Regions:
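Sec-dependent signal peptide recognition
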Residues: 2-7
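N-terminal signal peptide c-region/cleavage motif recognized by signal peptidases
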Residues: 13-15
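N-terminal secretory-pathway/extracellular module detecting exported/lumenal segments
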Residues: 19-103, 107-184
Length: 184
């Protein structure tokens, strides 16, 4: 009788384990399968640079104590497109005051970045560039900071520009900040 009961329990446990592994994993309301299908069928929308940024409206965000540059996003340029790309104007200011201005995109699901245009003297120069993987420890750490802390919580793009602006003002997206608090 005990052997029969042990076999039954083992069978039920095995069936339950098999059932759990077949359930789709869900991120941001989408299953892994849905995310993979979107990645395979993805098409980028046509992109044009926004109006040139104004210094007085820029929002600063922290990158690292290792850099002497200061980094800013123009809130007026921030968009979350129907193609799942968060686009924004980035300003990197050197200690001497020189500004590197770029119009960029983050593809959250793929963890990739792309530069659409370079800025200078109040105007944009379009740039043909490919999507590149965001490397957490690369020289260009600001991409990882914007990806991980502000615009791509849980690998999903922000839903609205206002959500991204609020994340910049708070020092991080609420979903990320809450997750960090729960890990402590």
């Amino acid at each position: 009788m005990r052997r029969l009961l042990a076999c039954l329990l083992a069978g039920v446990a095995g069936a339950a384990a098999a059932q759990n592994t077949n359930e789709p994993q869900v991120q941001g309301g989408k299953s892994d399968w849905e995310i993979e299908q979107e990645r395979l069928n993805w098409r980028e929308v046509d992109v044009r640079p926004p109006p040139y940024p104004k210094d007085e409206t820029l929002i600063e965000f922290r990158v690292s104590s290792d850099t002497r540059f200061r980094f800013f996003v123009d809130p007026a340029s921030l968009t979350s497109g129907p193609d799942g790309v968060v686009r924004f104007t980035l300003v990197a200011r050197s200690p001497s005051g020189y500004a590197n201005v770029t119009y960029e995109g983050l593809r959250c699901v793929a963890k990739e970045t792309k530069v659409y245009a370079l800025g200078g003297e109040g105007r944009w120069t379009a740039r043909e560039s490919a999507w590149r993987l965001i490397e957490p420890r690369s020289f260009q750490r600001w991409h990882n900071e914007l990806y991980a802390w502000y615009f791509c919580p849980n690998r999903m793009p922000i839903e609205t520009a206002a959500e991204g602006v609020e994340a910049l003002r708070r020092g991080g997206h609420p979903a990320v900040l809450i997750d960090m608090q729960n890990r402590r």
